[in-house]
């Protein structure tokens, strides 16, 4: 029963994010067709829309994050994707590798959540000689 509730919560969260992504700041960050976002982080005119691959994160299994970065011209550059657990004051045991795919799209591979709880994704972005750190939370069961 608890597993079913977790799946329902994740599906509801994804639907809310999809509606928010589709309606808020659509001109600032257009999501290509077929890209079903898991989350979004915004700060000072920079937006990162991302999805996890696979969409459902399994504890103890590696996963990837595909991110789209939008913002002022020239396009901001994503320099790092990481995650940590603020309540536990620790991060992942693995360092993901980040690769640029062009047109503001990036893929980080090798992420792994080893325990349930609230995780915070961190995106470091450089634009106009300035570094900005964007973050957003995700509950993992």
Task: Name the predicted role of every residue range.
Residues 2-14:
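Bacterial N-terminal signal peptides that target proteins for export
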């Amino acid at each position: 029963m608890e597993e079913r509730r977790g799946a329902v919560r994740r599906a509801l969260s994804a639907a809310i994010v999809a509606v928010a992504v589709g309606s808020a700041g659509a001109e600032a960050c257009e999501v290509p067709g077929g890209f079903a976002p898991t989350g979004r982080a915004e700060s000072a005119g920079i937006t990162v829309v991302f999805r996890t691959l696979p969409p459902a994160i399994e504890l103890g299994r590696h996963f990837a994050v595909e991110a789209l970065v939008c913002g002022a011209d020239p396009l901001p550059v994503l320099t790092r994707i990481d995650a940590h657990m603020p309540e536990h004051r620790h991060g992942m045991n693995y360092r993901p590798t980040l690769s640029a795919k062009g047109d503001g799209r990036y893929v980080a591979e090798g992420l792994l959540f080893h325990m349930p709880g609230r995780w915070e994704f961190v995106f470091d972005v450089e634009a106009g000689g300035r570094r900005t750190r964007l973050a957003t939370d995700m509950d993992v069961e």
